[in-house]
């Protein structure tokens, strides 16, 4: 079983002229050094299919809900400035699941928007929350793309690139 250590959520502005067949390819930024990353998949609602003839209630799976993700993480000026300047814009998001920081267990991609707010300032640490709205159906893209990450001396990403396989 894999752990979530080094899972990351990355983003970029939606390209004005995406490349046919390799939409998700390009350079991304780390959204926030996250403490946890919620699922972009909402729960599936159930549709009641019970009739007066049925002895028990019956249901079928309906649509999944797509809402928002509250991603709490480290409050860093450079990340805060980037997120504030991207507020209200359509963005491409990818969640890199796995322990290598490159999506070894899976890469989930979707289009959405984000906003940032600082959390309560305490004597312990300073955090902020990025609220990400999921506006398209998330899709798994790890079979089609590779991820290259350049990191600084502390292991924090300085450049994240997705390329078509």
Question: Which residue stretches match the model-derived regions?
Answer:
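Acidic glycine-/aspartate-rich tracts in secreted/extracellular proteins
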Residues: 17, 76-78, 137
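Surface-exposed, hydrophilic segments of mature proteins
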Residues: 16-22, 103-109, 163
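A short, polar/proline- and glycine-enriched secondary-structure boundary/capping micro-motif
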Residues: 23, 82-83, 143, 159
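A structural detector for beta-sheet-dominated domains
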Residues: 12, 31-40, 96, 135, ...
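Structured, beta-strand-rich domain cores
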Residues: 57-102
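Viral virion structural and adsorption modules
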Residues: 1-4, 133, 137-165
């Amino acid at each position: 079983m894999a752990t979530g250590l080094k899972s990351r959520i990355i983003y970029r502005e939606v390209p004005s002229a995406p490349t046919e067949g390799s939409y998700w390819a390009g350079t991304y930024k780390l959204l926030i050094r996250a403490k946890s990353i919620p699922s972009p998949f909402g729960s599936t609602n159930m549709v009641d299919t019970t009739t007066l003839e049925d002895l028990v209630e019956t249901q079928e799976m309906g649509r999944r809900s797509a809402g928002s993700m509250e991603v709490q993480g480290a409050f860093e000026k450079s990340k805060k400035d980037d997120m504030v300047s991207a507020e209200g814009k359509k963005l491409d998001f990818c969640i890199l699941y796995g322990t290598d920081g490159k999506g070894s267990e899976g890469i989930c991609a979707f289009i959405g928007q984000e906003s940032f707010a600082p959390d309560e300032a305490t004597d312990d640490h300073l955090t902020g929350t990025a609220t990400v709205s999921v506006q398209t159906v998330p899709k798994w893209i790890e079979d089609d793309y590779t991820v290259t990450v350049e990191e600084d001396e502390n292991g924090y990403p300085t450049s994240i690139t997705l390329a078509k396989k």
